[in-house]
């Protein structure tokens, strides 16, 4: 028997606005209350880099905006690069029989994955960030 029109729920749970901070995923549950009615599912939260991408955009081009589609593409790009670097760093640690990924493995994996000048700039910015973190942690 097909569901009644009143029982349909809108499917906006998976969408996140472009300027929101990274969020955690939570599993939503439907449970039956004493009256026999179903409770609404809690919205699942999605982790994104949207707020960070937006902050960098405003530093570089303060008067420029970004569409949700472009934000989604950039978020996928960041996730892809992050996964590639992490996988390569994991392989390097395994080759050297180490159980810990250090900044050295990350740096080497960035040099292997990114081409030429882009790798040099990435290593430079990464070194600068690690130095800044180390000096503030003391």
UniProtKB/Swiss-Prot annotation:
Spans annotated as Disordered = 1-47
Alphabetical list of SUPFAM superfamilies matching this protein: Histone-fold
Main site of residence? nucleus
Q: Where is the protein situated, by its record's location annotation?
A: Nucleus; Chromosome
GO annotation, cellular component aspect: cytoplasm; fungal-type cell wall; nucleosome; nucleus
Q: Which GO terms describe its molecular function?
A: DNA binding; protein heterodimerization activity; structural constituent of chromatin
Q: Which stretches does UniProt call biased (Basic and acidic residues)?
A: 1-10
What the entry lists under Pfam families is as follows: Histone (PF00125)
Instruction: Cite the record's Low complexity compositional bias ranges.
Output: 11-20
Modified sites of kind N6-acetyllysine:
8-9, 15, 24
Cross-link Glycyl lysine isopeptide (Lys-Gly) (interchain with G-Cter in SUMO) per UniProt, renumbered positions? 8-9, 24-25
InterPro entries in the cross-refs? Histone-fold, Histone_H2A/H2B/H3, Histone_H2B, HISTONE_H2B_site
Cited function = Core component of nucleosome. Nucleosomes wrap and compact DNA into chromatin, limiting DNA accessibility to the cellular machineries which require DNA as a template. Histones thereby play a central role in transcription regulation, DNA repair, DNA replication and chromosomal stability. DNA accessibility is regulated via a complex set of post-translational modifications of histones, also called histone code, and nucleosome remodeling.
Q: How does it assemble?
A: The nucleosome is a histone octamer containing two molecules each of H2A, H2B, H3 and H4 assembled in one H3-H4 heterotetramer and two H2A-H2B heterodimers. The octamer wraps approximately 147 bp of DNA.
Q: What is this protein called?
A: Histone H2B
């Amino acid at each position: 028997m097909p569901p009644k029109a009143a029982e349909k729920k809108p499917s906006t749970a998976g969408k996140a606005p472009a300027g929101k901070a990274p969020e955690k995923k939570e599993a939503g549950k439907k449970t039956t209350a004493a009256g026999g009615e179903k409770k609404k599912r809690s919205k699942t939260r999605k982790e994104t880099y949207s707020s960070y991408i937006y902050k960098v955009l405003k530093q570089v081009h303060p008067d420029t905006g970004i569409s949700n589609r472009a934000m989604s593409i950039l978020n996928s790009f960041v996730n892809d690069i992050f996964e590639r670097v992490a996988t390569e760093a994991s392989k390097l640690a395994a080759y050297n029989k180490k159980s810990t990924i250090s900044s050295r493995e990350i740096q080497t994996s960035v040099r292997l994955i990114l081409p030429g000048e882009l790798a040099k700039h990435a290593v430079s910015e990464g070194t600068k960030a690690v130095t800044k973190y180390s000096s503030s942690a003391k």
